Regions:
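Pre-active-site segment of Zn-dependent metallo-hydrolases
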Residues: 12-49, 59-64, 105-108, 129-132, ...
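Catalytic core of the metallo-beta-lactamase
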Residues: 12-16, 23, 95-156
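Short, polar loop motifs at secondary-structure junctions
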Residues: 9-11, 76-83, 126-131
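Binuclear metal-ion centers of metallo-dependent hydrolases, dominated by the metallo-beta-lactamase
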Residues: 85-96, 103, 154, 164-209
C-alpha cells in the first residue's frame, strides 16, 4: 500500500492512504506560517488531534479545514472534546484506532491528556509522547521538544521498531539544527534497519508499506 505524507509544519501531517485524506494535529505553528495555503487541506475526511496544546490544535485552522472538508469527523481526547464544544466544534473520542501515549512531563508540570493514533494500519502518530509500546510500519516521531530529547526518541523508535521514522515536532529547530539532529538520528536508527525519512515543511513523500 502506498502512503503519501505531507508535512505542514511541526507535528501537523496530511496523510493520504486508501483514498482518504487524514489531517493530524493542525496547530498554531502551521496556521501562522505564511506558506500555508488553506487549499492544501481541501477535502479531508478525518481530523485527528492528539491533545490540546496550541502547537497541536488551532481552532482557526481546524475550523477552516472543516469548512473545506468532506464532512470530516474530529477525533481527540475527552479533555479537548470539551474545549472544542465551547467553540461550537463537535468532536468524538473514538473511531480511528488509538494507543496509549501519555504526554511527557513538561517544565511547568504534568502534561494534558494525550492519545496516539494508528492510521489505517500504516502510520502511527504519538503526539507529545515517547512512552508508548506499539507502532505501525511508519512512525511519526518527535525528536525535538521541551519535554523530550533526540536520544529518548531514537531509543523509543528502536524499541518499537517501525520500518520508517518520519521526524516531527521540530518547529523549535533551525535549518542547520534539523540537519545535525537528523543526521544523528539516522546513524542511530540505521543500526536497527529503520529508515529515517525527513520531510521538509510543505513537501510530500510517498512510502510503500
Amino acid at each position: 500500500m502506498d502512503v503519501t505524507i505531507t508535512k505542514l509544519v511541526h507535528a501537523c501531517l496530511l496523510v493520504e492512504t486508501g483514498g482518504k485524506r487524514i489531517l493530524i494535529d493542525p496547530g498554531t505553528f502551521s496556521w501562522q506560517d505564511e506558506r500555508l495555503d488553506p487549499s492544501m487541506v481541501d477535502g479531508v475526511d478525518r481530523v485527528l488531534i492528539t491533545h490540546e496544546h496550541a502547537d497541536h490544535v488551532s481552532v482557526e485552522f481546524l475550523r477552516t479545514a472543516l469548512e473545506r472538508s468532506n464532512g470530516a469527523a474530529v477525533e481527540t481526547t475527552p479533555a479537548l472534546q470539551a474545549i472544542l464544544a465551547e467553540h461550537d466544534i463537535n468532536a468524538v473520542t473514538d473511531g480511528t484506532p488509538q494507543f496509549a501515549a501519555p504526554h511527557e512531563r513538561i517544565p511547568i508540570g504534568p502534561g494534558p491528556q494525550n492519545v496516539g493514533f494508528h492510521i489505517d494500519g500504516v502510520l502511527s502518530h504519538p503526539g507529545d509522547s515517547h512512552s508508548f509500546v506499539e507502532t505501525m510500519p511508519i512512525l511519526a516521531m518527535p525528536f525535538a521538544a521541551p519535554w523530550g530529547s533526540l536520544t529518548n526518541g531514537a531509543d523509543r523508535a528502536r524499541l518499537v521498531r517501525p520500518r520508517y521514522v518520519v521526524p516531527i515536532q521540530d518547529w523549535f529547530l533551525s535549518g542547520g539544527g534539523r540537519t545535525f539532529m537528523y543526521r544523528l538520528a539516522k546513524m542511530a536508527l540505521d543500526k536497527d534497519g529503520i529508515e529515517l525519512v525527513q520531510i521538509e515543511d510543505f513537501e510530500s513523500v510517498t512510502l510503500s508499506v
